[in-house]
Amino acid sequence: MRSPASSRRASALHRLCDSCRACGLSKVRCSKEKPTCSRCRRRGTVCEYVVTKRPGRKPDSRSEVEPEPGHLSHPLPSPESSTAISQGNLPDPDAFDPLFALPEPFDSTPELHSGPLSTVDSSLSSALTTWCPDFDDFFSFPVSTEDTLSGDRGAVYDGTIKHPPNLRRHSESPPAVPDDTIYLFGKPVDPAPPDQSLPATTTIGRRASPPSGRESEAGSRRLSCRCLIRALDLLKHFEVIRREAEIESSLPSIDAVVEVNKQTTEAITGMLQCPCSQKDGYLLVLLALIVCKILDRYAAAAIPGTEQGHDPTRRLDEGPMAGQRVLGELHCIQRVMNQLGPRLRMHGAQGASPGQAFHGTPAPLSVGLGDQLEPELHQRLSRLSSEIIRLLREAQ
């Protein structure tokens, strides 16, 4: 036998609606007369009062077994799994908890999920179910409390870092954690001092534009062309040799003289191949002086008594052999003079043009100086060869 409380609960659960079904569908006010309202009586329709559907638990639902709280909590990923995900070792998508998966389309309305869009929906659903952000790795990233704008405000972000290193899922190695947040404003500046020969950048993080062909060629010539310094070194070397000979009170051997003069002649030939020898008049004057030094050394080695302050009898190499050796080397000097002479005349003509002497011309040759240097070199060479030939004839 049922108790009064259970009967009242049952009657409350099965309460009828205030409006009949016909008035409810027509959305008009019902007279609430039972068993037939006045509107249904007037229309001649069936008046039916349905049972109300109250929200809430179903009766006797507490008797069912409630799920344990442990099944509803999702375990947090361990640090090992976070490291594996950050290094590119993604877990199997099928191994994810179904709580994070999107619900499948409703089966009650198949017409809404059929057609060409069903494939796109299914692919999007599968892509979203396999995505799992690594939040543990993200929150473990240290954040500096310093002001990020207190650094170099002139830095320009060059766009090479598209996302923070901790969100890279497919990197080869775990990202290096910087000490501060200055990496957000561009690449760090190299503490090493820059090369003075390279163009300096005016903005940190901005790469200098590559030089053009003409600029690079001019820069290479500026760095590699040291002809004027080499010419001065050759003159200094001749002075050192002269002072050493004075200290030793003896003349060098013919082999040493020929070897030094041959190396000097090759150096002059290399300088004449440089483009600066066609523009720099100072270099041409120095080369002419070096040629005079070479001829003087050949004369001192081949002709007895030419070198002042030394006894001709103390020469190591005497006789016609030294003259023949020097005479065989004069053709190299002749080739150098054939290249040097026209350039001396050209710069002498430029110095003779009006106004060149007062506008910073690179040619130090005054009017007629180039025309005087070239004949002087040829006269020295001609006198030396004539004297050597005379001595060789007398020795016979």
UniProtKB/Swiss-Prot annotation:
Tissue spec: Specifically expressed in conidia.
Superkingdom as given in the UniProt entry: Eukaryota
Description of what induces expression: Expression is positively regulated by the transcription factors brlA and laeA.
Region of interest called Disordered, as start-end residue ranges on this chain: 54-120, 190-218, 346-365
Disulfide bonds: none
Cellular-component GO terms for this entry: nucleus
Mutant phenotype after disruption: Resulted in loss of trypacidin and questin production.
Localization, UniProt: Nucleus
Composition skew (Basic and acidic residues), residue ranges: 57-71
Keywords for the protein's UniProt record, in alphabetical order: DNA-binding, Metal-binding, Nucleus, Transcription, Transcription regulation
Molecular function terms from GO: DNA binding; DNA-binding transcription factor activity, RNA polymerase II-specific; zinc ion binding
Compositionally biased spans, kind Low complexity: 72-82
DNA-binding stretch(es), residue numbering of this chain: 20-47
GO biological process: aflatoxin biosynthetic process; secondary metabolite biosynthetic process
Protein role: Transcription factor that regulates the expression of the gene clusters that mediate the biosynthesis of trypacidin, a metabolite with antiprotozoal activity and a possible role in the infection process. Trypacidin is toxic for human pulmonary and bronchial epithelial cells by initiating the intracellular formation of nitric oxide (NO) and hydrogen peroxide (H(2)O(2)), thus triggering host necrotic cell death.
Family annotation (PANTHER family): MONODICTYPHENONE CLUSTER TRANSCRIPTION FACTOR-RELATED, OLEATE-ACTIVATED TRANSCRIPTION FACTOR 1-RELATED
Protein name per its UniProtKB record: Trypacidin cluster transcription factor
